Amino acid sequence: MLEVLDMAPPRHQPAAGKAGGGRGHGHGHGHGGGGGGPAARKQPLQSSMAQPKAETAAATAAVAPPEGGKKCGGGGGRRRGGRGRGGRAGAGPGPGLAAAPAVVVAPAARAVIGPPVASKGLSFCRRPGFGTVGARCVVKANHFLAELPDKDLTQYDVKITPEVSSRSVNRAIMSELVRLYHDSDLGGRLPAYDGRKNLYTAGTLPFDAREFVVRLTDDDDGTGVPPREREYRVAIKFAARADLHHLRQFIAGRQADAPQEALQVLDIVLRELANRRYVSIGRSFYSPDIRKPQRLGDGLQSWCGFYQSIRPTQMGLSLNIDMSSTAFIEPLPVIEFVAQILGKDVISRPLSDANRIKIKKALRGVKVEVTHRGNVRRKYRISGLTTQPTHELIFPIDDQMNMKSVVEYFKEMYGFTIQHPHLPCLQVGNQKKANYLPMEACKIVEGQRYTKRLNEKQITSLLKVTCRRPREQEMDILQTVQQNGYEQDPYAKEFGINISEKLTSVEARVLPAPWLKYHDTGKEKECLPQVGQWNMVNKKVINGCKVNHWACINFSRSVQETTARGFCQELAQMCQISGMEFNSEPVIPIYSARPDQVEKALKHVYNMSLNKLKGKELELLLAILPDNNGSLYGDIKRICETDLGLISQCCLTKHVFKISKQYLANVSLKINVKMGGRNTVLLDAISWRIPLVSDIPTIIFGADVTHPETGEDSSPSIAAVVASQDWPEVTKYAGLVCAQAHRQELIQDLYKTWHDPQRGTVTGGMIRELLISFRKATGQKPLRIIFYRDGVSEGQFYQVLLYELDAIRKACASLEPNYQPPVTFVVVQKRHHTRLFANNHKDRSSTDKSGNILPGTVVDSKICHPSEFDFYLCSHAGIQGTSRPAHYHVLWDENNFTADEMQTLTNNLCYTYARCTRSVSVVPPAYYAHLAAFRARFYMEPEMSENQTTSKSSTGTNGTSVKPLPAVKEKVKRVMFYC
């Protein structure tokens, strides 16, 4: 086993500024002055990771803030067994942890009897109380209170014969059944149906089991077969009573598991009417009538819609309504659609092979209706495009194989003269018996969602449509609720569900911005951000890097050497002004190269520089890129980071021609952290005043998994983990990446073992490597772990926590027996639909410039989970559109954070993001993990997307092999190369 953890740690020196004292600036936030003060915290820590549990518990308790907002579930105080797996708070240690003696607390501490353990055997962290820090205010949330019905709900099994795969057809069958039998056999009941095998009623039906016969005329299925009447047998059989008692218990916090069945019933009931009115996609509904569709280009248009979901919250059941938009195929005549795709007049000349293939891809699977038969609007699904133009197409008209041309057939049969015989025909219906339809005789059917990848222009257009100011967004949501008319909804009435038409008013708090520390040689040594923003004027980075040896390569034909040289000099000067030691001259003259020669050019510049430096390293490469550079950016990053071991900074041509001080300042910040410097640190960090970070060596992780885009069936998913490499500053983050099975959400390489012929069983993985790296960087071993995990949906919480917490434990134990630092595991979510609005949009003191709620606004009541530890935090100032708060859910907490401590730490970290002088919307470690995962996509060789395997491939949980990514060079992965 690799021994890296047995030397006594040197006493740690903070980055800069006054370690220890430091001005308080009115901070403290109810944390008892930091719990023990700087002096107590700077004692040398025990060197062994096998530190006795009792001592750790005692040490942690010694620096705990005063009694008051501590953990419930056994009496408060900080204990290592705070939230063990399989029990409530205080119910004992988690796996791999020896039991620690409980800390004795005063009788005044609250004692709460926890609810029963979750049936899964693992309970998520209970809410420790509510936060109190910050200026109190009221915000409005797009949650609408739903009153629970007091009726019994009954579930019935449905079996339709012959079996139908289409939900819409199933719904049509059930609608016809209800129409025929509502007043008779169904006893006046109006059931809600999920479109599959479940039917729900308020109360019971007059029977336990019955079979019905329903006749339905087929809707056009696009195959071209004439519609006919079909007979279906529908068997309805009693299945179970859906008990709402457990849902009430869960909302009251007296039950651990959310009763999914009861929630599902209510969700289906409230979606029943919308399913009939709108196009349903996932949890959203779309219609061209909600707002006028906007053209996105290339034959697409945006449809406005709304998201709807029923959720259990502290205030009771809540209906979450949000606006959404997505791309639909514009219902154009096919000729017009083709003209938009090709961006030119297609009527006048034949299609080239390349254009024909492009059109075939765009039209395959699309439903069209014919326009040459008057009122007969038969529908067909396009299966392909003919290779020949229409005037060359012939087909047999009888068994004797007498042939007729398509042009003649349409003239004789329908009196339709084909105007553009040089264009190919659409092939529709069955491939074996192809039917030909002239493009000009077809129109695209309305309401077809576009599922392929959008191009950049379309994405920009769609974002413009969805970008609505908070006031407009709020009005749209309220209007949607009124249009949906839940009061008049016959299904809601039937089941006794009442929906409020008012946004929920929620008590919130605005957390104060943290003081930031800059270098003492700058005019401004400390800075207090205003409304989530500040700037670098009169400030110098707290730890400036040294760049002695750099080179520049110019891939832009339009940038002359003198222009490039002037830009590089300006950038070097800005780096110096910002506090870096930056050589004004490159190692070799600026080298111009063609983008298609990227690898050759990079290696040439690298080798030329090494020859000139006589054994010294080239430290930084600047690259000037054309504005539209295709794969060039990714190629540069891949070659520099996985082949040459070189840090690079790319700059676009438009910025070289139009040099702005703001741009140069931002680039200099990126260069500084890429080269190992620090831009700023929290004043509280270097003053040893951050609860549950400053008291003992603490490592903060961020993790994310990014998946390939829709349509990429075999590309691997990319997992990234970053971890802080400095303490107490927690500002520098090293990052590791790995490829794993397609759409695999669990991070496979957190901890791994493999057999080596020489060394036997070898242990490794990203957590282990980053723990070792922290020790090397700080001389300390982490005695506490805080893990921010991005990209996990609610349905995956349990699985992700179980797998990844276990991997963290194993990684720690592999370094030293009994090494189990306490872990806090927090899921970060941005893809939710909760929006927060100012209570009064006219009150400028309660909004930022964009009309959004103020940065630092936190909500942990009313719309949050009934009993678990979660909160919404809007940590950033809005720029355009409506801000989306991040949702943080603490799934596991052995460090016993109070609500204030977790919320304040998370908010303060959002001011340490290295790439800009703004607070960001997601906690930086999670943000960095996302950047690192995104960067790693560039490392994949083109053939990796073809799912090729190699002898060194790693195997995902579903058994598929994934080719590993090329390794990032050692000196690159030590720094924030992904910024």
From Swiss-Prot:
PAZ domain boundaries: 333-446
Subcellular location: Cytoplasm
Gene3D superfamilies: 3.40.50.2300, paz domain (2.170.260.10), Ribonuclease H-like superfamily/Ribonuclease H (3.30.420.10)
InterPro entries for the chain: ArgoL1, ArgoL2, Argonaute_Mid_dom, Argonaute_N, PAZ_dom, PAZ_dom_sf, Piwi, Piwi_ago-like
Location (main, coarse): cytoplasm
Domain (Piwi): residue spans on this chain: 620-941
UniProt GO cellular component terms: cytoplasm; nucleus
Deletion consequences: Malformed leaves with an altered vascular arrangement and abnormal internal structure. Aberrant SAM with reduced OSH1 gene expression.
One example of a Gene Ontology biological process annotation: regulatory ncRNA-mediated gene silencing
Domain of life according to the entry: Eukaryota
Bias-annotated ranges (Low complexity): 54-67
Keywords of this entry: Cytoplasm, Developmental protein, RNA-mediated gene silencing
Compositional bias annotation for Basic residues: 77-86
Chain positions covered by the region annotation Disordered: 1-95
Chain's role: Probably involved in the RNA silencing pathway. May bind to short RNAs such as microRNAs (miRNAs) or short interfering RNAs (siRNAs), and represses the translation of mRNAs which are complementary to them. Plays a role in the maintenance of the indeterminate state of the stem cells in the shoot apical meristem (SAM). Regulates leaf formation through vascular development and may be involved in determining the central domain of the leaf founder region.
Name of the protein in its database record: Protein argonaute PNH1
Organism, as annotated: Oryza sativa subsp. japonica (Rice)
Gene name linked to the record: PHN1
